[in-house]
Amino acid sequence: MLRSSFTQSRQLLLSQARSRTAAQWLPKAGASNRLAGQRFFADAKPPVTGAPTPASPSSESSIPPETVPKPSPAAEAPLPPPPPPAPARKTGRFRKFLLYLILTSGFAYGGGIFLALKSDNFHDFFTEYVPYGEDCVLYFEERDFYRRFPNTLRNQNRAPKDEGHTVTIPSKSGLSWKVAEEESGADVSQKGPHMSALDNGDKAQLKPGAAKPEEKVATVEKVKAESAAKEQTAEDKKKVKEEPKKPAAPAVTPIEFATVSEGDEEVVQELVKTFNDIITVIGADENAHKFSGAVNKAKEELRTIGEKIIAIRNEARKAAQEEIKQAHATFDESARELIRRFEEARAHDAAQYREEFEAERERLARAYQEKVNTELQRAQEVAEQRLKNELVEQAIELNRKYLHEVKDLVEREREGRLSKLNELTANVNLLEKLTTDWKEVIDTNLKTQQLQVAVDAVRSVLERSTVPRPFVRELVAVKELAAGDPVVEAAIASINPTAYQRGIPSTSQIIERFRRVADEVRKASLLPEDAGIASHAASLVLSKVMFKKDAVAGSDDVESVLLRTEHLLEEGNLDDAAREMNTLKGWAKILSKDWLSDVRRVLEVKQALEVRLGPFTSLFHLYR
């Protein structure tokens, strides 16, 4: 019973927890769906690998896994559904294309309209081939026109034009000033029988084989009827032309021209001239008397207009004269006011300049007075100081005279045993000087002797050793005894460190090693620079059978160089022997390279001992 109730209560609790979990997951799922469409800096999270957590001693349980109750299937909460995949982001290519197309079209139309307004050729091309180009150009031209002529929009109260009914005046419908004259002869170009014959001939050109007999008969009858009708028409016209001429119309009384004597304006004269031309045209017409009333009325109006223009001009002249008089009065008043202001400003400036001048004059006078006082004070001080100096000089001169007199008196008193005190003092000073000089000579001699002993120790090590022996301690002793002398430092620095660390061979060792090297050089004397194994073998065999020859002066062959080097070594001239061996080339020089390096070290040491340390030894012999 207890178990069943416990199970039921557990299932109830699990169901409530499951409902709460589902209710909590729903808003979270909606939020994840809303956030899926947004972009953040870290949309794609790296996959989290489930690394095994190491078991700690505290986490280990003493309960065996068999006794742990397994969770019931109802206790497992269902997993929330996975969020839907993020929708694909729109690229907006069509919008970009449409935007670029609109911008490009706008720039193209704008540039085209600008060029069309500047160039006539491009204007024709743009308005003819570009859609809506003519409307755009007309719109901007109207805007430019209204900008240049803004008064065109003011007279909007005028009656609109009646463009609905168009009046057409046919040609040759008016009157002419010439009297109609009859033509003197026949005009061949007018229509008549001769023209109809040609037309009928063209119409009658048919294929003879293609026409039927009935059509031929009908065509002939039709042509006969037309020719008869045309002949009748020609006879009627001839009768009309043969009628007698009517008498000409009587001459029309000419209309007087309009004159405006007072109108000397150019516009009025042009208007009168135009009106007179119209009168001339009307007077040449037969019905000129019909227009005489209108012409006279126009003359009166023209004369009235001239009088009005003259009146307006007189009024404008009077108004201009009044304005000129008023401007003159205003100008005179302004000039008087300007002169008054100028006088006031000049008086004010003069007073100000006078005050400044007085102040500056007082300042300069005060400064000059101070300068004069300072100069007088300095001159007085200089004079007083000069007097003091003269008094001091006189006092010094008196003291000198007094001392001289006292000295003379003392010298007279010394004529006895104190007469040679000065000579004794001079001799004592000379002895002190000689003692000091000899002390320096003795110290230098002692130092030179010690240095000579150290140098002799180095030489004895080099000459008496049968094998190369290092002489580092001897060189250290020489360096310490030199006490920082630059010559000794340079001599020691010129020696190769390998020479005094490992030692140098003696002259006998150098000669002995030269003989061994000479044998090897003779074996390789016949080898070229790029010799192989066969060349080495051939050179070895030939060197055994070669005859030794005497050294020839100026010869640079291997045998001569070796002989000259051997003679120089026997004489003890290592420098010239090294120079001779250095002239070898090829394999001979390569084989003698080690021997040359040893000789070079020996020469460096000897040069340092003889050339650089030689002056110290000569100085020692000099003092000894």
Curated annotation (Swiss-Prot):
<feature type="coiled-coil region">
    <location>
        <begin position="295"/>
        <end position="440"/>
    </location>
</feature>
<feature type="region of interest" description="Disordered">
    <location>
        <begin position="180"/>
        <end position="249"/>
    </location>
</feature>
<dbReference type="GO" id="GO:0061617">
    <property type="term" value="C:MICOS complex"/>
</dbReference>
<protein>
    <recommendedName>
        <fullName>MICOS complex subunit mic60</fullName>
    </recommendedName>
</protein>
<comment type="function">
    <text>Component of the MICOS complex, a large protein complex of the mitochondrial inner membrane that plays crucial roles in the maintenance of crista junctions, inner membrane architecture, and formation of contact sites to the outer membrane. Plays a role in keeping cristae membranes connected to the inner boundary membrane. Also promotes protein import via the mitochondrial intermembrane space assembly (MIA) pathway.</text>
</comment>
<comment type="subunit">
    <text>Component of the mitochondrial contact site and cristae organizing system (MICOS) complex.</text>
</comment>
<comment type="similarity">
    <text>Belongs to the MICOS complex subunit Mic60 family.</text>
</comment>
<keyword id="KW-0809">Transit peptide</keyword>
<feature type="compositionally biased region" description="Low complexity">
    <location>
        <begin position="46"/>
        <end position="65"/>
    </location>
</feature>
<dbReference type="InterPro" id="IPR019133">
    <property type="entry name" value="MIC60"/>
</dbReference>
<dbReference type="GO" id="GO:0042407">
    <property type="term" value="P:cristae formation"/>
</dbReference>
<feature type="region of interest" description="Disordered">
    <location>
        <begin position="42"/>
        <end position="89"/>
    </location>
</feature>
<keyword id="KW-0472">Membrane</keyword>
<keyword id="KW-1133">Transmembrane helix</keyword>
<keyword id="KW-0812">Transmembrane</keyword>
<dbReference type="Pfam" id="PF09731">
    <property type="entry name" value="Mitofilin"/>
</dbReference>
<feature type="topological domain" description="Mitochondrial intermembrane">
    <location>
        <begin position="118"/>
        <end position="624"/>
    </location>
</feature>
<feature type="transit peptide" description="Mitochondrion">
    <location>
        <begin position="1"/>
        <end position="41"/>
    </location>
</feature>
<feature type="compositionally biased region" description="Basic and acidic residues">
    <location>
        <begin position="212"/>
        <end position="246"/>
    </location>
</feature>
<feature type="topological domain" description="Mitochondrial matrix">
    <location>
        <begin position="42"/>
        <end position="96"/>
    </location>
</feature>
<feature type="compositionally biased region" description="Pro residues">
    <location>
        <begin position="66"/>
        <end position="87"/>
    </location>
</feature>
<feature type="transmembrane region" description="Helical">
    <location>
        <begin position="97"/>
        <end position="117"/>
    </location>
</feature>
<keyword id="KW-0496">Mitochondrion</keyword>
<keyword id="KW-0999">Mitochondrion inner membrane</keyword>
<keyword id="KW-0175">Coiled coil</keyword>
